[in-house]
Design a protein with these regions (language model features):
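N-terminal active-site beta-alpha-beta segment that forms phosphate/nucleotide-binding
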Residues: 9-90, 94-99
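Short, flexible active-site loop motifs that bind/organize anionic cofactors or intermediates
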Residues: 3, 25-27, 138
Length: 211
């Protein structure tokens, strides 16, 4: 990352934190992955039950490995050996003390956009876990809500499709086909425009993370 890009992220990050707090999110800006990991861990009480949705950003800063190694009651869907066990773990995550996730996009006015196939991730963001910790790189930030929704649909979803390898049109074309296939990963689009009692804690990272 160039020095100019770092300054750009730092300045936008400071403004976005202010705008998120105006919407009653708990928000933090960390310049590096290392700072973000330290901040995220400081928000999780020892002994908490902790689960997560699919979250490359959490993985990239080392948060998932740190939680697995820490003094927490971990609901690890990635350790499940069968699809039935995985589905059960995903349901248990909805009642976790702490739920970890990323964001597909954020708008500079402080709104968060997430797109989901199964719906477990957006469900946990809306209700269930006592707190939600969101890790998001500054590459996820767009100037306005329309651009954030567009990013979720035309950037995040097609890139995640490459990871999943499902037979959806965007896997072949690299762009959203507005599909209605059974394997569609864009069944739910969630806009979180306001947060109750700082339940959602957003850790912004001044680096490019996730998709």
């Amino acid at each position: 990352m160039t020095e100019m890009q770092k300054k750009y992220y730092d300045k936008r990050g400071a403004l976005l934190v202010k705008n998120l707090k105006n919407r009653h999110f708990d928000a933090y800006y960390c310049s590096t992955k290392e700072e973000a990991l330290e901040k995220a861990l400081s928000l999780i009480p020892v002994g908490d039950s902790v689960g997560w949705g699919g979250c490359m950003s959490c993985q990239q800063i080392g948060l998932l490995d740190a939680v697995r190694a820490g003094e927490y009651r971990v609901i690890d869907r990635d350790a499940c050996k069968t699809m039935e066990e995985r589905e059960t773990a995903m349901r248990h995550c909805l009642l976790a003390d702490t739920f970890l996730t990323g964001a597909n996009a954020l708008s500079m006015d402080g709104q968060m956009v997430n797109i989901d196939g199964n719906g477990n991730r957006v469900a946990a963001i809306v209700y269930g876990p006592k707190q939600v910790i969101v890790v998001a790189g500054m590459n996820k930030v767009e100037d306005n809500l329309d651009a954030a929704i567009n990013r979720a649909r035309t950037v995040a979803a097609p890139m995640n499709q490459q990871r999943f390898g499902l037979p959806n049109p965007c896997g072949a074309t690299g762009t959203c086909g507005d599909c209605k296939s059974e394997t569609c990963i864009c069944n739910q689009i969630l806009i979180t425009r306001h947060c109750k009692n700082a339940r959602i804690k957003i850790v912004l990272v001044g680096e490019d993370l996730g998709f």
